[in-house]
Amino acid sequence: MFRLSALLGGLGLAASVLACPSGQQQVCAVVCFCAPISQADIEVLYEDVSQMAASGLEQWLLQSRETAAASGTLPIPLHIRAQLEPYYDIGVLDAARYKVGDGETLGAANTMLQNPDVQAVTLIDIIVFRNAADAQDNVALWAHELLHVQQYQQWGVREFTRRYTRDHDAIEAPAYKLQIEVARALRAQVAQSGPAR
């Protein structure tokens, strides 16, 4: 089943839910209807729309990154970096920068990145946090966002956006998995150290 509806806010091509006559496929663009189009044509259309969505996301990321960089960024806080060194190559940790509170960038991220509860957004190598507390204390969130920095490094911006528009869950799942792993490790570390005195 294609995920086109996730790409362009409701424009989609889905597997047949309603029976279409022979030689027709269900096409959904605001409403669903049967059209005399082959599965091969649907795949070509899907690829074209997917490429347009990826290109738009790529341009937004590049422009947003430049805007964020121009207004100033900071390196990863040392206490955060020290806790994440076991999880990341030095190249990821050295490349990543951050800033706090750019509401306009985060607002666009809510729309562009299909995630209504964004706490941070990674603009290639710049992580924009919604609030300063997360930037200074949320090691698990840092782990999540740094995985995206690593993905950008491995794939490049164009390939990242292509993959993201095709299946954003496949991009986010490993980041959420690592976020949970780091949170558990931190809780275990606190439990082993005992109560504060």
Residues of each region from the PLM?
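A metal-dependent hydrolase signature that marks the N-terminal structural subdomain at the beginning
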Residues: 20-101
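Auxiliary, metal-adjacent structural segments of Zn-dependent hydrolase domains
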Residues: 71-121, 126, 181, 185-187
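Short pre-active-site segment immediately N-terminal to the catalytic Zn-binding motif
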Residues: 112-114, 122-143, 165-167
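Catalytic Zn2+-binding segment of zinc metalloproteases
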Residues: 132, 146-163
